[in-house]
Amino acid sequence: MSQGDLPAIHGSEWRASAPLSFTQPLLADAARTEVLRFIAQRHDGHLFLVANVWDVLIENEPAQFEGESWHTFTTRFIEAVHRGLQAQIQAKMGQDEGVEVIPRRTMDVFLDRRAQHFLVDLRLTFRRLAHYMAVGIGQRLEWQRTMTRTRKLDAHLKTIYADGMATPDGGSFGGKGFRSTWQEGVVAVATALRRQPDASRDAVPGKGYDGDLVAPMIRDIGLGLAMGDTPLDVMAANLGKAGSNQNGGWDGAGGRDLHVGAWHVGVLPPTAPLPIASVTMTGLAFAAWRQNLDRFHVACIGEGTSSSGEFWEAMNLAGARGLPICYILQNNQIALDTPPAKQSGVEVWADKAVAMGFPAWTIDGSDPAAWHASAAVAREFAMEGGGPTLIHVETMRGCGHAHHHDDLYLGNASGTPPGYVDRDLLAYWEAKDPIPTHRQLLLDLGVDEIALKNMEEEEQLLVDKALKTVTEMPWPDPETVTKGVTTLNDAETHKQRFDRLKTPYEGSEAPAPLAVGETTLDYVESGGWTYARAIQQAMADIATRHGDQCVFIGEDMEVAGAFGMNMALKNAGHADKLVDMPLCEAVIVHTGTGAALSGMRPMVEIQFGGFAALGYNALINNAAMLRWRWGADCPMTIRIPLGAKTRSGPFHANMIESWFANDPGMVVIAPGCPQDAYDLLMEAAELNDPVIMLEHIGLYGLGGGLTGWGQNINQKVDTSPVQTAIDEGKRHKIGKAAVIRGGRDITLVTWGSMIHIAKQAADVLSSEDIEVEIIDLRTLLPFDAQTCIESVSRTGRLVILQEGQWNGGLGHTLQSRILESSFYSLEAAPVVIGAIDTPVPFSPPLEDFTVPSLDHVIEVVRFSAQS
């Protein structure tokens, strides 16, 4: 691709492959109305052209169409419209065709591209009408059944909320839920998809489940049910009972999240930061695109959440890459308490797709067949290379945001509160309630009233049975909540923490791993690898090991990557695994998360530490929680270059390890030397957890092979031990701290760039007969407390050295945990050394002043050792 290329118009070559079989004729007048309705919505400037072409061509057509005749007619119609567009341009533009509309884009090129988008929209409109007319009575009966199930389930959930269920502490709890009132038509989306409702409970996409994937909104219970979720699972999740599938992958450990979902049948559980589901589904679509999977993706979102930046980032990526996904944007007339007119200035919500370069249209949400036909054409288009689409659904939420919100929104029968809902709007949509209106349509189509009543009774029995079962279902054992934070660790209980305080620690008896003055941190003058080279080689070896499962995504990846870190991948023949992403960290991380859920092993790069703030929601509220919430593997590595002594100033050099200390679920590593950089990155790529690798730019060796401190830290890296451990399914270094210098008088705990300052300080102090034992944590979260405790119990003193700012730094958390088990071994007050509490400055003298210097470290350690 050339730098000056224009964006691809995905779907411009798409054509409906074959006629569909209509279940009833399509009246020509009705078809004309539907087509002109769409043109008025999306391309009003072409309204008269389309109407005129229709009126000319229809003269030789019958009054109604069957599938074959409709297919033939629409093909001729689009060709005629195209000719009409060309004729208009030739007649009106003349010599102006070559004029630049914008720099490097002439009038003829500009208008031709506009025409291509218009013709794609026309083809989709005609095909959508064909899918609508192909709907059969069997599909309609399924929709009616699932809508009925949804409404009856919602009624039970509201009753449970109001009445509550007895909890073990003698209280009452009714859970929380989001009803679907008047939005049940979404169930019809599922009949347009490839489903596998009988997949085993342990299935995941690609392993036992091979259907399409959906990301419902929090109130799209019906879509989940239509895919294969059950009323019992929905109730258990909304109540937080032990049998909920929000169990971290542990039987009987449910209740961790109130949101529903059924990943084993392709239903992605939503999250409270609502755009997360749609962006994650975009990541899953990205994985399908990369892996050439025959899989379609549906992401539902409300008009309120469509204001979020992450939703725009998702659409932007999908449009740029032509991903196989459909976004369903439901305007239900209120986002909690904020009306649509205060959310956006778009004329219709479908306009939001225009800026992203892909098709969109609007439907009436009270018509299940419109949902089905739209999803069907979106799937057909995407699966044949057309790319993404957006379906704007006009509907209304006939209830409060959640059960507790009904009175505020609709009003209480007592009149207090009175409710603020627009009564005219409410009456309009109540008259369009899809369940009774579609039921009447079924009767008009000849379905027997008794058959419908029998179905409704069956659905009532089904949800009644689920209610009985969930009532008898136990509440989760409280201690199960600690299970499965990461594959490396569970959480401690309060009792375990207290027992630790009560139990004297005998760690002073633990033998020292190194003799006093002995070190494992060796450098070489020649023949060694820089820190950067070790990381580069690890990436190349990971790509070789995992093949097409591996993908490297981030900003500016395909040319060389930041600091040229991707050149080794290209030189090793892995250029095809490098993917440039739009400049938005959130969608980069969410995409990696989706790819990981699809079975890939993505390696994500955030270019600088400060930029990670833009991806924080994606890291903390999405990737970090997946295992603990519902037991999902998320084998994703996130590389974040950062650190001082690079003269890169604020935003780039931030040390951010403390950001993640209070949000469990991620493994955080911070290698300080080439050998550990290679080993830890290799191991990170094997974990089924999100792993953040904080790699210090100042250690890369960009200054002629020297660090930002002017040191040579090059090492001869032995790649065999970690590869052997991986092959044998064993842990090598990850999760384990290392004593890198034996000492006697004081323990110095550190990580990353500071291990080299620590070693220099120890060498100086050794000449003063002060022997410092240095511990390199290597893995920060979860950290190896035991190695630190054993050392402090031997030396009696503790200093923690961090490059990051002192206030709120990770060192204080580490210190607290170490001292709980070694306090009575102390002979002096523990100390944390950190940077001064300012952002990282740009100017060399300022930056050098803020970061802990060698002289300062020597001074503090000497004082502590002599105290």
Task: Give, region by region, the residue ranges found by the protein language model.
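Glycine-rich ThDP/TPP pyrophosphate-binding loop and its adjacent helix/strand module
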Residues: 11-38, 43-46, 53, 266-465, ...
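Conserved acidic/glycine
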Residues: 2-192, 207, 396-573, 826-867
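Thiamine diphosphate
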Residues: 188, 265-333, 363-381, 558-633, ...
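Acidic-glycine-rich active-site phosphate/pyrophosphate-binding loop
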Residues: 243-261, 349-350, 559-572, 721-730
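Cofactor-binding active-site loop characterized by glycine-rich and histidine/acidic residues
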Residues: 172-321, 339-350, 355-357, 650-652
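Catalytic-face loop-and-helix region of soluble metabolic enzyme cores
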Residues: 421, 806, 815-831
